[in-house]
């Protein structure tokens, strides 16, 4: 489809902010507060194209997937092409929303991509040994407590994490 060959309707919607329920006093992007906005974008004047501007560092993987699925469902149902545009940031869950497009556009300075998961901990093993503290952890299964700051970390543990 050549989008410049005839008069067509194009709707634009912006998805900005952290993805997920942020609590009582802050609004994040959730399926509940995005659904009607997206439905209107895909139905008002029967657009051939919906442009979705995204500016999000990500957030909830569940909400990211629900919003992604809603965009794809509406695009297929209404036979509408989707162009996603990364503004400043489309990272993590924002990147997932970005991938809902048939065409993806990003500025060369936009931060785009799956930034992954970070897990940090401290190691206190030598300290508790020096203090004579005995620690007991009960788990079922192999290495369930591998992030315990009072245990040594093995290469196997690190590989399991990443």
Task: Give residue spans per PLM region.
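Small-residue-centered hinge/linker elements
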Residues: 1-80, 89-162
């Amino acid at each position: 489809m050549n989008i410049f060959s005839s008069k067509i309707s194009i709707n634009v919607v912006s998805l900005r902010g952290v993805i997920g329920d942020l609590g009582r006093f802050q609004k994040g992007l959730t399926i509940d507060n995005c659904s009607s906005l997206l439905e209107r974008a895909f139905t008002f004047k029967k657009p051939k194209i919906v442009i979705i501007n995204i500016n999000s560092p990500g957030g909830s993987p569940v909400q990211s997937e629900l919003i992604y699925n809603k965009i794809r469902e509406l695009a297929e149902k209404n036979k509408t092409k989707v162009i996603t545009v990364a503004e400043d940031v489309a990272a993590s869950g924002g990147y997932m929303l970005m991938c809902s497009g048939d065409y993806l556009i990003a500025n060369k300075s936009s931060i785009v991509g799956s930034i992954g998961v970070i897990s940090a901990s401290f190691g206190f093993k030598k300290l508790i040994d020096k203090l004579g503290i005995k620690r007991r952890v009960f788990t079922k299964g192999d290495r369930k407590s591998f992030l315990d700051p009072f245990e040594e970390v093995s290469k196997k543990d690190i590989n399991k994490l990443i």
